[in-house]
Each structure stands twice: as structure tokens, then as C-alpha cells.
Amino acid sequence: MPQVTMRQMLEAGVHFGHQTRYWNPKMAPYIFGARGKIHIINLEKTVPLFNDAMNFLSSVAQKRGTVLFLGTKRSARESIKEEAERCNMPFMTQRWLGGTLTNFRTVKQSVARLKELEAAETDGTFDKLVKHEVLGLRREREKLDASLGGIKEMNRLPDAIFVIDIGHEDIAIKEAKKLGIPVIAVVDTNYDPALVDYAIPGNDDAIRAVQLYARAAADAVLEGKAAAPNSASVREEEFSAESADEGKGRRAPAKKGDKKADAAE
């Protein structure tokens, strides 16, 4: 598991919270104190929680699960997109569309439309249309790509969501909670850590801090993927199990009227 040290967190400014007047009392256990009316986050509490969260992400990836990277605030967009692409996971960096999770069937229809327009632009279909029609279709494609481009290969609901700012992404978190999707999130001093499954107390504004979180999350996913059994070994195990079952059937055929044997088969 890739480790992030306390020194790295200090250098990235993870320990700087929000102004003391904006604090959420439920963050009190993770606050070291205040400096110049700014809360200081206790990194001795953050590090183990951070490692727990990264271990969970790794375990999701090891089971071939999907992690949706989410960061639509300006300071998070670039890092979230870059790191999600590096570990080949879906992402959203523009405005969260209400119903992305809870109305996923409709979202998939919009994604299908995006793919249709992308294909039409490359297969020569656009060349057969008049200029104003092409412009209209390109605008539609650009709009869909901006909002859904990062999830166009996400064919089912994600197994977990990695979030940078829970206040900024509150609608997404509510949708995930409704569907029972685990949320791993950076929680600053002005929010309630109980709103998510894996809270990482830390600065959710500083670009360097966001880069650190996103890079570590991508590393955790990549490590989990590397530890996942490959398809060949999975098939070999299935074949061995099938052979064993067949052998058992030949050696000990069930007797008529033997309900236990019938159930075992």
C-alpha cells in the first residue's frame, strides 16, 4: 500500500482547516487547535484514517470494482481528471447532474447519445450534412462530453466514490447514500465527517493537498488492480472446481430418495 507521510501532508498544507467561525463541532476530535483564527487539523488523526481509506479503495479495485473520482470545484478538476485517467477509472469534474446515480438508466441514454455523435463525427456522417446542422450537433456533443465524458465507459453504478469536498458534492453524496454506495471523502473542518463512510480530515481547498489525495487514491487503485487475479487464473480455478464437482458426481452418485444427496448436487 503506497504510504503518504505526515511530512508530505504538512508540505501540501493538509493541516490547514477553515476559519474557526465556520467550524463544525463534529470535527472537534480531529482539530489540534487554532492559529490566527484558522483551525489546524491534527495530522496524527488524519494519517491512519487516510490509510484506512486508501486500503479500502485498493480492496475495491482488487475485486475489479469501479471507483468514481469526483471533484467539480475548480481547485480539484485537473488533479481528479488526471489521476482518474491514470488508473483508468471514471470521473466527473464539471457540475454534478442530479440523478447521475439514482437515475442511472437515463444517464446511460445520454451517454449513448454522446457515443453516437462521436461516431458520426469520425465516420463521415457529418460530411453529408449542411454546415448549420453540423454546428448544432457539435455543440450538443461538446455539452454532453463536458458533463458525461468522464463516465462514458462506466456501464454500471460505481462500487465506491472518491470525493474531494463533501459540501460541494452534497447531492452526489446523498444519492450514493440512498443507493448504499460507499463514499470516501476529504472532510474539512466545516463539515460533518459522519456524512461519509471513510472520512479523511484535511484541507479540501489547497491545490497541492488535492493533488496529494488524488495521486494516493489512484496509486491505491492501481495497486489493487495489480493484486487482482488475472482472467486466466480465475478461469483455471473455475475449471478445477468444475472438474472436482464432476469427479464427485462420478464417485458418489446420489441414491434415489436421498434428499441430502440431491441437495448436495
UniProtKB/Swiss-Prot annotation:
Q: Transport: present as a keyword of the record?
A: no
Q: Give the family, as the similarity comment puts it.
A: Belongs to the universal ribosomal protein uS2 family.
Asked if the Swiss-Prot or TrEMBL record annotates the protein with the keyword Iron, the reply is no
Q: Do you know which Pfam families this protein is assigned to?
A: Ribosomal_S2
The protein's name is Small ribosomal subunit protein uS2
Identify the keywords attached in UniProt to this record, alphabetized. Ribonucleoprotein, Ribosomal protein
Residues of the region (Disordered) are: 226-265
From what organism does this protein derive? Answer: Xanthomonas euvesicatoria pv. vesicatoria (strain 85-10)
Query: Which residues lie in Basic and acidic residues bias regions?
Result: 245-265
Task: Please provide one cellular component term from the Gene Ontology annotations of this protein.
Answer: cytosolic small ribosomal subunit
Among InterPro entries, the record links this protein to:
Ribosomal_uS2, Ribosomal_uS2_bac/mit/plastid, Ribosomal_uS2_CS, Ribosomal_uS2_flav_dom_sf
